[in-house]
């Protein structure tokens, strides 16, 4: 989905579609010469050997791994002013002891902790967080998820309040 949007709506010259799994990429995209399909590839270990040029943009939607483990690789791949949008999934960031039935994290305090950790990981890996919002679409099991907008390099962070974002997400996306 995000590959198609990046390719079609934003005029990307080349899209690297990275997935640790196999057979996930839409067949229309597989046949597109602008799309490089990198299946059975763990984004945590990506280097310039696999992706030789600096990237201007990255869309990150990972499962079963923390963004804190992905951002170091992204730091090495993005151009100096490159940007990224990361889907922050509390169920994969919070730690098992804070995840409820069916992998759902309902506690707003845990969501706040997750977003604070995301800010720390971003800064530690040379990113400025320009914005954070909640996704209007819940995850498959009903998790509230968040979108973080990053720019590579240190700069002035966006003007946002994590407690207000978490509160709004829980009031707007009630069960």
Walk through the language-model features, giving the residues of each.
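Short alpha-helix
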Residues: 111-125
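A short glycine-rich, Lys/Arg-flanked "PGG" loop and its adjoining helix->strand segment in the class I
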Residues: 68-83
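Conserved S-adenosyl-L-methionine
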Residues: 127-136
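Short, glycine-/aromatic-enriched active-site segment of Class I SAM-dependent methyltransferases
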Residues: 90-107
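Flexible, glycine-/basic-rich loop-and-beta segments that form/coincide
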Residues: 144, 148-175
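S-adenosyl-L-methionine
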Residues: 14-65
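Short, small-residue-biased leader/transition segments that mark boundaries at the very start
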Residues: 1-6
